[in-house]
Amino acid sequence: MTAPARRLCHIAFHVPAGQPLARDLHRVFGFQPLAVREAGGWRQLALRSGDAVFLVNEGTGPQEPLYSLDPHHSVPSATNLCFDVEDVDGAARALAARGCIMPVPPTRVRDAQGTATYTVLSSPAGNLSLTLLQRAGYRGSFLPGFRPLPCTPGPGWVSHVDHLTLACTSGSSPMLMRWFHDCLGFHHLPLSPGEDPEMGLKVAAGSGRGGLRLTALQTPPNNTVPTLVLAESLPGLNSKQDQVEQFLTRHGGPGLQHVGLYTPNIIDASEGMAKAGCRLLTPPEAYYQQPGKEEQILAAGHKPGLLERQGILLDGDKDEFLLQVFTKSLFAEDTFFLELIQRQGATGFGQNNIRALWQSVQEEAARAQGA
């Protein structure tokens, strides 16, 4: 590995001036403003919930936004992942030797609280760039160059980022897996016993409807980097685009499709967000009528009717369960959504839940087209 990622620092978004993402993250999802920077046509606002930090880069300017890159993308998008590394200068030299493109060379930023060094790396995943950051000893609330904002306790719905899902073009997962392994130290995480890293996990959506190929990657256990999931479409007999293909079309290529946010209490979190205006996906009606589903929900210690009313999916067996709920797109262009996830011993991603999500998104798309 060339520049092993040790921790996810933040996820950055690029949106036009006036786009309400920052407002929604605060009012709807319970993220609290952390720090702000306004310079050169950019307004950069960092928001935090637990250990999850989102950086919203709003506007445009003659220079790059600090700690990020202007992707000059035509639609709002999650455009950057920032990782903590031990040695930015050494990482940049090693990555350049591998032929990687570094649009922003190692740059030092100082303020009264200390120093941070960063570089920005282009990735082979569409408009997604990667920031490598070294800030050991920095004493501020966020990063040099940002003005800290008054700290206000939030609802605590989200504790950290559980996983990141990239929507990829068909057949590109093996190449992306090798790139993230060689450059950042990610390695294959099997989602099923005996899984072939080159093939990933195939999840069929139903007869003739294609499905998904998922490949999960993780860093060594001593690092605090979320699981990275590569998702690509499997062709079906139906000629209609599925949601991965629709994302690629609307987004203009591969990119970060959704972020899984861990919540210690998915019932309270989803209820609170819904009351604040969050639009949650509705699972297929048949999901909760599956044979054994009620018993499974009861075995996990939950009430079937409550999960159904809030659209929460549950999968697992024995003492290992996974609960998930998904938002509708945060952007009108349908290029990004969020997931809430609570784990009761489960470490993977339930195949039944994946199928249910697949069907939910397809049904939502059909309703939107008919509106």
From Swiss-Prot:
InterPro entries named in the record: 4OHPhenylPyrv_dOase (IPR005956), 4OHPhenylPyrv_dOase_C (IPR041735), 4OHPhenylPyrv_dOase_N (IPR041736), Glyas_Bleomycin-R_OHBP_Dase (IPR029068), VOC (IPR037523)
GO MF annotations in UniProt: 4-hydroxymandelate synthase activity; 4-hydroxyphenylpyruvate dioxygenase activity; metal ion binding
Residue span, VOC domain: 7-135, 160-328
An example Gene Ontology CC term for this record: mitochondrion
Reaction(s) catalysed (UniProt annotation): 3-(4-hydroxyphenyl)pyruvate + O2 = (S)-4-hydroxymandelate + CO2
Manner of cofactor binding, per the entry note: Binds 1 Fe cation per subunit.
Binding site for Fe cation: H163, H258, E339
Main location group: mitochondrion
Gene3D superfamilies on file: 2,3-Dihydroxybiphenyl 1,2-Dioxygenase, domain 1 (3.10.180.10)
Cofactors demanded by this protein: Fe cation
EC number of this enzyme: 1.13.11.46
Biological processes, Gene Ontology terms: aromatic amino acid metabolic process
Cell location: Mitochondrion
UniProt entry keywords in alphabetical sequence: Dioxygenase, Iron, Metal-binding, Mitochondrion, Oxidoreductase, Repeat
Function of the protein: Iron-dependent dioxygenase that catalyzes the conversion of 4-hydroxyphenylpyruvate (4-HPPA) to 4-hydroxymandelate (4-HMA) in the mitochondria, one of the steps in the biosynthesis of coenzyme Q10 from tyrosine.
Family per record: Belongs to the 4HPPD family.
Name of this chain's protein: 4-hydroxyphenylpyruvate dioxygenase-like protein
Species in which this protein is naturally found: Mus musculus
Upper taxonomic lineage: Eukaryota, Metazoa, Chordata, Craniata, Vertebrata
Gene: Hpdl
